[in-house]
C-alpha cells in the first residue's frame, strides 16, 4: 500500500478566540488542539506529517519539537485549497494524503482508519456528518442516485442547497498525484474570494473518481473550534467520554460531570473518585483506590488500596499499597512511598523515599530524604536540605522517632532506632539507639511580672 502522508492545516488567525495565543495551541483536556491532531496522525502510522502554519508560526513551531513534523509556512491565508497547495512539494506522487485540521482535535483514529482503508487512485474519501442545524457549513450535494457530486459552501449555496443537512467536515483523503493536478486549477471566484479545497470534489467527479463517504460515531469528533464557547463545549464532551469510560472500567464517580482527565488515566477495579478530581499526564490508579474531593494528581502511580484524602496534590510520585495521604498533603516529584505509609495534613515531600509503615502525620517538610521502615516524624519537622547553593540528604534509619518541631540540618544521618527530642535542631549524625536532644535549656524566673501599659 502506498505511504500515508497527513497534511494538517493550522495557519488560521482565530480572531474570534480574542487571544494572543494561536488558536490551535488552545488546550482541550490539558493539551494543545494541534498536539491532539499530531498524535492521532502518528497513531495512523503516517510516514510524514506536514503542518501548515501562518499566524503565530514561530509560537506554534516552538510548541512541538518533533522530527516527524514537517513545518510548511503559508505567508498569506488564501483559503484551504491554497493552504494544502503549500505542502505539495513535500508530497511524493505515490502518497495517499489525508487532510486534517489543527482546530478539530478529537477525531478518533478508528474513524480515520475506516475512511482511508480503501483509498487508492480511483477514489476520494470524504468524512461528512448530518446536522440538525447545518448553518455555516458546506453542504454535500448528491445526484438522484445518491452519489456525491460537489460541496457547496454556505455563502455560495442556493436556498434549496441550504436545506441539505449532510455537511462537509473538511476532512478528506486523496492521492497526492490528484492533488498536484487539481489544486493549481482552483479558482477563487466565489463569495469569499478564497481557494476552496472542497472544489476538488467536483473535479474528482469530472475525472471519473468515485467519492466514498464515511461518518464519525459522534458529531463532536469533527467539531471545530472558532471561539471559547465551542472550546468549552468540546472540553465538556471529551470529559463526559472519559467519565463514561472510567465507570465502565470499574470506577465509581461521585459526579460524572465533575472530573477532569487531562492525559492518560488507567485504573483498576472498585475505585471511588470524589468530586473535582483532576488527573494530568500519565496516572495509574490500582484496585480499591479512594480519591477524595478536590485532589490534583499528575504523572503518578497510586497502588492498590491507597487513599488520597481531600485537597491533596500529587505530582511525579509513587504511592504504595494502602498508603494514606492527606488531607491537604503535597507530594512533589521524586517522592516514593512504600506500603502502609501515612502522609498527613499539611505535609510536603520532595525527592523523599519513605519506607513501609512510616508516618509523617502533620505540618512537616521532608525533602531530599530517605526514611527507613516504621519511622515516626513528629509535627512541625523540617529537613533543612538547602544551603543556598546545593541540596543535601537526610537519612533516617528504621524505627527512628523524631519529636515534634525538629529541624534536621542536612547532610545528616540518623541511625536506626534513634530518638530525637522535641524542639531539637540536629546538625550531627546520631548513632543507633541514641537519644539526641539539641535545644536551649529552659529557665523559669520566679516573681516575674508582665509589662503594663504606661
From Swiss-Prot:
Can you supply a Gene Ontology BP term from the record? cell wall organization
Q: In which pathway does it act?
A: Nucleotide-sugar biosynthesis; UDP-N-acetyl-alpha-D-glucosamine biosynthesis; N-acetyl-alpha-D-glucosamine 1-phosphate from alpha-D-glucosamine 6-phosphate (route II): step 2/2; Nucleotide-sugar biosynthesis; UDP-N-acetyl-alpha-D-glucosamine biosynthesis; UDP-N-acetyl-alpha-D-glucosamine from N-acetyl-alpha-D-glucosamine 1-phosphate: step 1/1; Bacterial outer membrane biogenesis; LPS lipid A biosynthesis
Q: What are the boundaries of the region Pyrophosphorylase? A: 1-228
**What general EC class does the enzyme of this chain belong to?**
transferase
Q: Which reaction does it catalyse?
A: alpha-D-glucosamine 1-phosphate + acetyl-CoA = N-acetyl-alpha-D-glucosamine 1-phosphate + CoA + H(+); N-acetyl-alpha-D-glucosamine 1-phosphate + UTP + H(+) = UDP-N-acetyl-alpha-D-glucosamine + diphosphate
* Record carries keyword Cell inner membrane: no
List of catalytic residues: 362 (proton acceptor)
Which PROSITE patterns is this protein grouped with? Answer: HEXAPEP_TRANSFERASES (PS00101)
Q: Where does UDP-N-acetyl-alpha-D-glucosamine bind?
A: 9-12, 23, 74, 79-80, 101-103, 138, 153, 168, 226, 332, 350, 365, 376
Which of this chain's residues are annotated to bind acetyl-CoA? 379, 385-386, 404, 422, 439
Query: Mind telling me which Pfam families this protein's record contains?
Result: Hexapep, Hexapep_2, NTP_transf_3
Example of a GO MF term:
glucosamine-1-phosphate N-acetyltransferase activity
User: Where is this protein localized, as stated in its record?
Assistant: Cytoplasm
Identify the stretch(es) annotated as Linker: 229-249
InterPro entries annotated for this entry? Answer: Bifunctional_GlmU (IPR005882), GlmU-like (IPR050065), GlmU_C_LbH (IPR038009), Hexapep (IPR001451), Hexapep_transf_CS (IPR018357), MobA-like_NTP_Trfase (IPR025877), Nucleotide-diphossugar_trans (IPR029044), Trimer_LpxA-like_sf (IPR011004)
Record region (N-acetyltransferase): 250-454
Q: Which UniProt keywords apply?
A: Acyltransferase, Cell shape, Cell wall biogenesis/degradation, Cytoplasm, Magnesium, Metal-binding, Multifunctional enzyme, Nucleotidyltransferase, Peptidoglycan synthesis, Repeat, Transferase
Q: Briefly state the protein's biological role.
A: Catalyzes the last two sequential reactions in the de novo biosynthetic pathway for UDP-N-acetylglucosamine (UDP-GlcNAc). The C-terminal domain catalyzes the transfer of acetyl group from acetyl coenzyme A to glucosamine-1-phosphate (GlcN-1-P) to produce N-acetylglucosamine-1-phosphate (GlcNAc-1-P), which is converted into UDP-GlcNAc by the transfer of uridine 5-monophosphate (from uridine 5-triphosphate), a reaction catalyzed by the N-terminal domain.
Tell me which family the UniProt entry assigns to this protein: In the N-terminal section; belongs to the N-acetylglucosamine-1-phosphate uridyltransferase family.
Instruction: Fill in the subunit field for this protein.
Output: Homotrimer.
Kindly give the HAMAP family that the UniProt entry links to this protein. Answer: GlmU (MF_01631)
Name used for this protein in its record: Bifunctional protein GlmU
Amino acid at each position: 500500500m502506498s505511504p500515508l502522508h497527513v497534511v494538517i492545516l493550522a495557519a488560521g488567525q482565530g480572531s474570534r478566540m480574542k487571544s494572543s495565543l494561536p488558536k490551535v495551541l488552545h488546550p482541550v483536556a490539558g493539551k494543545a488542539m494541534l498536539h491532539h491532531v499530531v498524535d492521532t496522525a502518528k497513531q495512523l502510522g503516517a510516514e510524514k506529517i506536514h503542518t501548515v502554519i501562518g499566524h503565530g508560526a514561530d509560537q506554534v513551531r516552538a510548541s512541538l519539537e518533533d522530527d516527524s513534523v514537517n513545518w510548511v509556512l503559508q505567508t498569506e491565508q488564501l483559503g484551504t485549497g491554497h493552504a494544502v497547495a503549500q505542502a505539495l512539494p513535500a508530497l511524493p506522487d505515490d502518497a495517499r494524503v489525508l487532510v486534517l485540521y489543527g482546530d478539530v482535535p478529537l477525531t478518533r483514529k478508528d474513524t480515520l482508519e475506516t475512511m482511508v482503508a480503501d483509498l487508492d487512485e480511483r477514489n476520494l474519501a470524504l468524512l461528512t456528518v448530518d446536522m440538525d442545524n447545518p448553518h455555516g457549513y458546506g453542504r454535500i450535494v448528491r445526484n438522484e442516485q445518491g452519489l456525491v457530486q460537489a460541496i457547496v459552501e454556505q455563502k455560495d449555496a442556493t436556498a434549496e442547497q441550504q436545506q441539505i443537512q449532510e455537511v462537509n467536515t473538511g476532512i478528506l483523503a486523496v492521492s497526492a498525484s490528484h492533488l498536484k493536478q487539481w489544486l493549481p486549477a482552483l479558482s477563487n471566484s466565489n463569495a469569499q474570494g478564497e481557494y476552496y479545497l472542497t472544489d476538488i470534489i467536483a473535479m474528482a467527479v469530472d475525472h471519473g473518481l468515485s467519492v466514498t463517504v464515511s461518518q464519525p460515531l459522534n458529531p463532536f469528533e469533527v467539531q471545530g473550534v472558532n471561539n471559547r464557547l465551542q472550546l468549552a463545549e468540546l472540553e465538556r464532551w471529551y470529559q463526559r467520554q472519559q467519565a463514561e469510560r472510567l465507570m465502565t472500567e470499574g470506577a465509581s464517580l461521585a459526579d460524572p460531570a465533575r472530573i477532569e482527565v487531562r492525559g492518560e488515566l488507567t485504573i483498576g477495579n472498585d475505585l471511588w473518585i470524589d468530586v473535582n478530581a483532576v488527573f494530568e499526564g500519565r496516572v495509574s490508579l490500582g484496585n480499591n483506590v479512594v480519591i477524595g474531593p478536590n485532589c490534583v494528581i499528575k504523572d503518578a502511580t497510586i497502588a492498590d488500596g491507597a487513599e488520597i484524602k481531600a485537597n491533596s496534590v500529587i505530582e511525579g510520585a509513587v504511592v504504595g499499597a494502602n498508603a494514606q495521604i492527606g488531607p491537604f498533603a503535597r507530594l512533589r516529584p521524586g517522592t516514593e512511598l512504600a506500603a502502609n505509609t501515612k502522609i498527613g495534613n499539611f505535609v510536603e515531600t520532595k525527592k523523599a523515599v519513605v519506607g513501609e509503615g512510616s508516618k509523617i502525620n502533620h505540618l512537616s517538610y521532608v525533602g531530599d530524604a530517605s526514611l527507613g521502615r516504621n519511622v515516626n516524624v513528629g509535627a512541625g519537622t523540617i529537613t533543612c536540605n538547602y544551603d543556598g547553593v546545593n541540596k543535601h540528604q537526610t537519612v533516617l534509619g528504621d524505627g527512628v522517632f523524631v519529636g515534634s518541631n525538629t529541624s534536621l540540618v542536612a547532610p545528616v544521618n540518623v541511625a536506626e532506632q534513634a530518638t530525637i527530642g522535641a524542639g531539637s535542631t540536629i546538625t550531627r549524625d546520631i548513632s543507633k539507639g541514641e537519644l539526641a536532644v539539641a535545644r536551649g535549656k529552659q529557665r523559669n524566673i520566679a516573681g516575674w511580672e508582665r509589662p503594663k501599659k504606661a
